[in-house]
Curated annotation (Swiss-Prot):
UniProt entry tagged with the keyword Transcription regulation: no
GO biological-process terms attached to the record: cysteinyl-tRNA aminoacylation
Source species taxonomy: Bacteria, Pseudomonadati, Pseudomonadota, Gammaproteobacteria, Legionellales
Keyword terms of this UniProt record: Aminoacyl-tRNA synthetase, ATP-binding, Cytoplasm, Ligase, Metal-binding, Nucleotide-binding, Protein biosynthesis, Zinc
InterPro entries named in the record: Cys-tRNA-ligase, Cys-tRNA-synt_Ia_DALR, Cys-tRNA/MSH_ligase, CysS_C, Rossmann-like_a/b/a_fold, tRNA-synt_1_cat_dom, tRNAsynth_Ia_anticodon-bd
NCBIfam families the record matches: cysS
Oligomeric form and interacting partners: Monomer.
UniProt source species: Coxiella burnetii (strain RSA 493 / Nine Mile phase I)
Binding annotation for ATP: 270
Annotated protein name in UniProt: Cysteine--tRNA ligase
Length: 460
């Protein structure tokens, strides 16, 4: 067994050798819980869900930790706007997170630490940084990390200090010695959550939370740290600096970064206002369509969210389920060369595009067996296909369930398309075409109602 993974730290694929043979300790940066999760977050969840499933299938004992940031400036701001406590807001969105996670078929982490549960460990790490002279107390009472004191700063993002811009998710403050210094502990402000510390009442900064939680649970160093590409700098860079300056030993062996989900060639993000929530996405597409789409590109590459790409995902899954339909269910007891080749693709930095191409080879082979009336061979290969599909969280329905749902989804898309065409005809005062399309919709059992708000429809 030889899995190769691209290490962002060394910028090359490496043969993965866990620190402890047969055991993998994995930490992935989780959510700041102040709003609904969007499908860009969903991509990162599903990518690392795939990594965990695959490593476990390959025989590794995986300890998967994903944190929750439940105290943060954004949480405090949103709670104030909503006139609720930060704790109540965070708890509400933690429940929503868990519901979305389940809806996406994402495996729950083995441990899910919350920042507020690890304040003593955070304070202990900050004290070590002060003792080692990597941190200082500013004039305003905040505690800052002294970036220029840490000589390896920039080794993950592969940039020199002089190239790095201040202000990129690093708060600007007159109390800093250097614009790149970042806050470890924030002095309490009136009405904000606070904890006692040697430096006065306050709360943790964002970056120090992950350093303290990951090392407290997994030890230091641990095997793999993952997250979205947008976290590489400054968040992950700062984690390395804090952890290695505080503990005086390496932090993480291997860094994995998931490519971003784009919409109209821009990163999907709340700041750009172009997000699609996980809940909205699941109203439009089945969970398996979403999972297939989000895993269809290599995890390190950007992926474009579009109706066309989602439709391609639906059609791909339809091919899988059509191949499985009508075959007897048999136990998956032995594997063929297909499984070996699947492992070969996935062992090469989780190359899902090649792995999916191989699954389609299996579909073609199943169909050939079926055409030649070799039903037993088709059924055996179908069982193997379902087993491999499980690594991606796919092929969990019966063929009848999925295909009936896909037909309904296709019908809805066709209805919406006809309504759009009718609205275009009405806008051009082409009443003949508009009436013809209305008749088509009536034949499909669809009643439409026009109003000043637009056209609504229902199936009769």
């Amino acid at each position: 067994m030889s899995v190769k993974i691209f290490n962002s730290l060394t910028k090359q694929k490496e043969i993965f050798k866990p620190i402890e043979s047969g055991k993998v300790k994995l930490y992935v940066c989780g959510m700041t819980v102040y709003d609904y999760m969007h499908i860009g977050h969903g991509r990162s969840w599903i990518i690392f869900d795939m990594v965990v499933r695959y490593l476990r299938m390959r025989g590794y004992e995986v300890t998967f930790v994903r944190n929750i940031t439940d105290i943060d400036d954004k949480i405090i701001k949103r709670a104030g706007e909503n006139k609720e406590s930060p704790a109540a807001l965070a708890e509400r969105f933690i429940q929503i997170l868990h519901e979305d996670e389940k809806a996406l078929r994402v495996l729950s982490p083995d441990q899910e630490p919350r920042a507020t549960q690890y304040v003593p460990e955070i304070i202990k790490l900050i004290q070590k940084l002060l003792d080692n002279q990597y941190a200082y107390t500013g004039q305003n009472g905040d505690v800052f990390f002294d970036v220029r004191r840490f000589k390896d700063y920039g080794k993950l993002s592969h940039r020199h200090l002089d190239e790095l811009q201040a202000g990129a998710r690093v708060e600007v403050s007159d109390s800093k010695r250097d614009p790149l210094d970042f806050v470890l502990w924030k002095k309490a402000k009136p009405g904000e959550p606070k904890w006692d510390s040697p430096w006065g009442e306050g709360r943790p900064g964002w970056h120090i939370e992950c350093s303290a939680m990951s090392s407290s649970i997994l030890g230091q160093p641990f095997d793999i740290h993952g997250g979205g590409l947008d976290l590489k700098f400054p968040h992950h860079e700062n984690e390395i600096a804090q952890s290695e300056a505080g503990e005086e030993k390496p932090f993480v062996k291997l860094w994995m970064h998931a490519g971003l989900l784009e919409i109209n060639k821009e990163k999907m993000s709340k700041s750009l206002g172009n997000i699609i929530s996980i809940r909205e996405a699941l109203k439009e597409s089945d969970v398996e369509v979403l999972r297939y789409f989000l895993l269809s590109g290599h995890y390190r590459n950007p992926l474009s969210y579009s109706k066309e790409n989602l439709e391609n995902g639906r059609l791909a899954l339809e091919r899988f389920y059509l191949a499985l339909r009508g075959l007897p269910v048999v136990n998956h007891e032995k594997t063929s060369s297909y499984t070996d080749r699947f492992y070969e693709a996935m062992d090469d930095d989780f190359n899902t595009p090649i792995a999916f191409a191989l699954l389609f080879e299996m579909v073609r082979e199943i169909n050939r067996f079926r055409d030649n009336n070799q039903i037993e061979k088709a059924a055996v290969l179908a069982a193997e296909l379902k087993c491999l599909g499980n690594i991606f969280g796919l092929l969990q329905y019966s063929p009848e369930q999925f295909l009936q749902g896909a037909k309904k989804e296709a019908d809805v898309q066709e209805i919406k398309k006809l309504i759009d065409q009718r609205n275009e005809a009405r806008a051009k005062k082409d009443w003949k075409t508009a009436d013809q399309i209305r008749d088509q919709l009536t034949d499909l059992g669809v009643a439409i109602e026009d109003s000043s708000d637009g056209t609504s429809w229902r199936q009769e």
